[in-house]
Amino acid sequence: MTPRTALGALHIGALMFGLTGVFGKLAAASPAVIVFGRAAFAVLALAFFARFASQHGWQKLQAVDWRRLALSGVLLAGHWVSFFLSVKIAGVAIATLGFASFPAFTVILEGLIFRERIRANEIVLVVLVSIGLILVTPAFDLGSGATIGLLWSVLSGLLFSLLSLTNRASSGRIPAVQAALCQNVVVALCLLPVAAPQLSEVRALDWLWIALLGVFCTGVAHSLFVASLAVIKARTAAVVFAMEPVYGITVAWLLFNETPTPKMLLGGALIIVAIVVSARMSGHADKKTVAAEAASH
């Protein structure tokens, strides 16, 4: 794969990740069913990639690895359920922008968990995200469905941040595809008791959207990221990954006529700038960490 091809694959992967909220809105099913189906189809796609395309062998897992993968799988399940709840309540644009607040949570949690000193530019990042969220908030009223949806998406961002830090603590030993596959198995098992009674009611068309969500927005997108990281720098991949909200909001605008207000556009711009700046600042991020983060959305 040439650098130009790899960069194109990264953008296609980011576009697929950006379509997550779109397919979630198209599927007329509960968030529990959507997340269960997404995880189940993702397991199939990732298993295919691991079998035929991955250059990394299957790592034998120890007890500590299983515990970390189980924890990260539970966090991933919570992240996805809260995100799709936000999509159903408030729409794709608000859900995507609320989730995009995760770099601010990461900065704060890194200081608390890893005892890392928060730098001045990271404080600016937190301020940018905070102002962006204030501007994106439809109304400061908990009786507003859109505001409740935004809160669900912010919770999704918090859980994603915790998941990223969990992956960071355990990255390096387990190949990214293997870790993603195991995490999706945990997600499917977590949601199975809730989703099982509803599965017979899901229409064929909705299964199509869920399958696309699991195969393309999870399995194929993650596989493209992993393949392109062979020739692309981790920081470049992180910056491209930061464009995911732009793709998602643009498609939602075109498909669902979710026209953002000028205030929402300004808030979204601040949040996206914060994500790009965060990605460029992450000099310590290695390729396995970036791949793990990509798999988690």
Where are these regions (language model features)?
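Transmembrane alpha-helices of multi-pass small-molecule transport proteins
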Residues: 29-78, 105-106, 159-166, 180-198, ...
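Glycine-/small-residue-enriched transmembrane alpha-helix faces in small-molecule transporters
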Residues: 1-40, 44, 71-74, 82, ...
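Hydrophobic alpha-helical transmembrane segments of multi-pass membrane transport proteins
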Residues: 12-19, 23-26, 49, 70-85, ...
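Hydrophobic/aromatic residues within transmembrane alpha-helices
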Residues: 27, 34, 38, 70, ...
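Juxtamembrane helix-entry segments on the extracytoplasmic side of multipass membrane proteins
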Residues: 2-6, 28-36, 61-66, 138-159, ...
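C-terminal transmembrane-helix exit sites in multi-pass transporters
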Residues: 50, 102-127, 134, 246-266
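Hydrophobic transmembrane alpha-helices of multi-pass small-molecule transport proteins
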Residues: 46, 50, 70, 118-138, ...
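C-terminal-most transmembrane helix of multi-pass membrane proteins
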Residues: 39, 50, 138-139, 206, ...
